[in-house]
């Protein structure tokens, strides 16, 4: 049910994007992305690590019969988060006007909604989570379709604010209100909450900082163009997060001697290869069919998003050098390295964007993603090398070859040359691919017969 809801929400997100691209002018759509992502960014920062804390402590409290503590943990951070959103929105209303206020608050509330949805997941109420998350998006899409000829920033904002607030009230009512045990709860969660805070505090920068910085140098129409590519790229990134999230608890349960064993090393290399080819699959989809996909989720005026989509997905391919290593570091308690890796990416991205965008325009933004990813890979591999340096070198060479074939295809359209290079990489990895398939087969068999 969870994965069905994920797929449906994934689909509805692109239906929503299509509606906006058809009925909203490009510059107005850019303003929409700026204001909505501003709300998501600020709301995401003020989550303050509580989603991860919920996932840890809510199941424990219910297991031990301490439901009142669980409800206090759910409600107080969520209510405070909502109140902070109202307070922050007041200056926006005064200085930026009603449209900006409505859109900012509408998308800020999405983060408050996510706190209650995290509580549902923590209680394994997958059906309730799936229904509320899908119904919220479906309602927004239906109302936007009904209002399509009259869509403005204000109508889009009113629809989102009304629906999000309604579902916030629905989710609020699902949990009995209890605030008294909060002091005792905070004492118990404090240490883990600090860990969660450092784990999640930089996440909004990855998702939204580009939307906030682009308007400093470029018109809103350029932001809307870039966001089409970014939304597609983020869709791929979200699907690639799933195997990492599924693997993290498996690693966490292993003892030190197990992590150092030959068997674990074999399985880890198999997982790295699986993750690499899963990422390569998305990259090739965007490279060969990217123009059609852009048309599918938007209109012909956004076709210029195609090269940005390919470049963004290529940075995702570069990140395979350290993505699984990062999961290993986080799962074994190396939170400082995890935090500093994120910090390096954010700082290097902002600096390169501020330097490149005035000179290269929108391509400066896209190249900033690549530069930040390369700097982060260098930092991570220097501080937390898991494999032999020669293995990382081979992986980097594969990525370089893939980049060369992509440039050749995009400039000349020579499809056969691209297929030849990809086939050569698969041939080189063929022995490792067979091992990966064997490990995967054994894992599936073990999970079916515990």
Residue ranges and their predicted role:
Residues 52, 75-102, 145-146, 169, ...:
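Alpha-helical transmembrane segments of multi-pass membrane transport and lipid-handling proteins
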Residues 1-9, 35, 40, 44-101, ...:
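Membrane-water interface segments that mark the loop-to-transmembrane alpha-helix transition
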Residues 5, 9-13, 17, 33-43, ...:
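Short runs within selected transmembrane alpha-helices of multi-pass transporters and secretion channels
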Residues 390, 409-450:
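Membrane-proximal transmembrane or re-entrant/amphipathic helices at the cytosolic face
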Residues 18, 47-64, 229, 233-272, ...:
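Helix-loop junctions and terminal segments of transmembrane helices
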Residues 24-35, 63-76, 85-108, 150-157, ...:
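Membrane-interface helix-capping segments at transmembrane helix termini in multi-pass transporters
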Residues 127, 131, 153-155, 160, ...:
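Interhelical loop/hinge segments that connect adjacent transmembrane helices in multipass membrane
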Residues 17-43, 188-192, 196, 214-234, ...:
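Interfacial/gating helices of multi-pass transporter permease domains
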